[in-house]
Amino acid sequence: MHTDLDTDMDMDTETVALCSSSSRQASPLGTPTPEADTTLLKQKPEKLLAELDLSGPPPAPGVPRRRGSMPVPYKHQLRRAQAVDELDWPPQASPSGSSDSLGSGEAALTQKDGVFKVMLVGESGVGKSTLAGTFGGLQGDHAHEMENSEDTYERRIMVDKEEVTLIVYDIWEQGDAGGWLQDHCLQTGDAFLIVFSVTDRRGFSKVPETLLRLRAGRPHHDLPVILVGNKSDLARSREVSLEEGRHLAGTLSCKHIETSAALHHNTRELFEGAVRQIRLRRGRGHAGGQRPEPSSPDGPAPPTRRESLTKKAKRFLANLVPRNAKFFKQRSRSCHDLSVL
């Protein structure tokens, strides 16, 4: 033990002598000398490490020290390259994946999380609000009315052994704001239920015009559309037959179903069928891709007069009694089956 202490004292004495001689010779700062190299080689590695200050300035009281093996947070790594304001740092995404905006990011998110938006459209007095209330009040599932909205209902339902979130909007007619809300429906809806009353032929005659408006608002999307003949329980007041509704659906390439919101007849089948139609259309869109925008290599086509929606609707109605009834019968054979395209 005395030998080790004497050796350490000798090393310290040589180090002091080396520092004194270096100061007298006024060697440039940082210039190595043979005497310094010899002294460093004689010292023990433990002593050299103890003399080195690897931790920097002492941490402030109460601040936890970070281990050398712990990675620096990603936010501070970015700050080394450029200044990052704490207020501008994006917050972590919420588990629910909700958002106030209705952009493409949210559209992709809703598709991933199984959220489907269904719009009820049609003339007034056909039973849209009754259908929406029936959907929100069906027993056996979790249903509630969304906050700050009297005409929007959200439910978790099971469709083909898969749980989804279905949101039903009844905002097609809202007084002075009806025009803006209708445009909002056109851009955000995943499926559209055109409701008409089987006791009102005048409202039934406006279905083609409503459908043309939907497709004109989103011309390059394969939108699921279901024609809903409501109030089927009023047999004595019926003005539109089941066959007429199916013929119209076959002509317009839509689905068709008759319901009675008052008796809850076919209401569950309607909304579950809407979910199936959305899935089928999305699956076909992913397989074949969206239809490309129309373009011409010779430049834009000259402007032409567009046919009004009223004239188009009249033309559709003129074809309700087809020349080849057998062809339209085959075409409308599966329009009532909401589980197929």
Curated annotation (Swiss-Prot):
InterPro entries: P-loop_NTPase, RGK_GTP-binding_reg, Sigma_54_int_dom_ATP-bd_1, Small_GTPase. Residues 90-106 have a biased composition (Low complexity). Residues 294-303 have a biased composition (Pro residues). It is found in: Cell membrane. Residues 1-71, 84-106, 282-309 are annotated as: Disordered. Keywords: Cell membrane, GTP-binding, Membrane, Nucleotide-binding, Phosphoprotein. It comes from the Eukaryota. One of its GO terms (cellular component) is plasma membrane. SUPFAM superfamilies: P-loop containing nucleoside triphosphate hydrolases. The keyword Phosphoprotein applies. GTP binds at residues 122-129, 230-233, 261-262. Residues 18-30 have a biased composition (Polar residues). Its main location: membrane. Residues 1-13 have a biased composition (Acidic residues). Binds GTP saturably and exhibits a low intrinsic rate of GTP hydrolysis. PANTHER family: GTP-BINDING PROTEIN REM 2, RAD, GEM/KIR FAMILY MEMBER 2, ISOFORM C. This is GTP-binding protein REM 2. It comes from Mus musculus (Mouse). The gene is Rem2.
